[in-house]
């Protein structure tokens, strides 16, 4: 079986932190994975940047997998290995880390809440999102949406 290949992508505003880039380089050098390409979009309209990168990857794809790293997150070879070792094209074609936000941004002490959700049906025949909280520790779980 041929070695699976990977592309890495991120968006930024024109600059990235040294810790972010050190994490990217460490993953590339220490993972033993064949990286096909790095994809980067610079700008200040994050939704448009993300669309541009994912469209380019789909249309010009030369890798089996895409690793998307937010440019304000530091990834380590150990964290990457946890994601990589749990990939499965049939059962888990998308694996996400957990990001946090808050429901009370105006409070002096914000409570971090995971941006992990499941879809729920509503009375009108549509759907909604329900936050998955609390999260189990150190486990992969199936969710409807993350980010």
Q: Where does each model-flagged region fall?
A:
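Short beta-strand-to-loop acidic/aromatic patch adjacent to the donor-nucleotide binding site
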Residues: 63-74
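N-proximal low-complexity "stem/linker" segments adjacent to membrane-targeting elements
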Residues: 1-43
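Residue-level marker for beta-strand->alpha-helix junctions and adjacent short loops that shape enzyme
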Residues: 13-15, 73, 100-102
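Alpha-helical elements of Rossmann-like donor-binding domains used by nucleotide-donor carbohydrate transfer enzymes
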Residues: 23-26, 52, 82
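Conserved catalytic core of nucleotide-sugar-dependent glycosyltransferases
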Residues: 76-147
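Active-site nucleotide-sugar/metal-binding loop of Leloir-type enzymes
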Residues: 51-65
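A short, glycine-/small-residue-rich helix N-cap motif at loop->alpha-helix starts
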Residues: 44-49
């Amino acid at each position: 079986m041929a070695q699976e290949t990977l592309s890495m992508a991120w968006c930024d505003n024109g600059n990235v932190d040294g810790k972010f880039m050190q994490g990217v380089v460490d993953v590339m050098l220490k993972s033993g994975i064949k990286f096909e390409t790095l994809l980067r979009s610079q700008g200040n309209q994050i939704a448009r940047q993300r669309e541009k990168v994912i469209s380019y990857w789909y249309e010009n794809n030369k890798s089996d997998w895409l690793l998307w790293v937010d440019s304000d997150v530091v990834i380590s070879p150990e964290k990457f290995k946890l994601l990589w070792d749990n990939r499965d094209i049939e059962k888990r074609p998308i694996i996400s880390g957990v990001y946090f936000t808050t429901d009370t941004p105006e409070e002096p002490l914000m409570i971090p809440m995971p941006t992990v959700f499941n879809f729920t049906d509503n009375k009108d025949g549509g759907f909604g999102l329900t936050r998955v909280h609390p999260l189990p520790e150190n486990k992969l779980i199936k969710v409807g949406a993350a980010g």
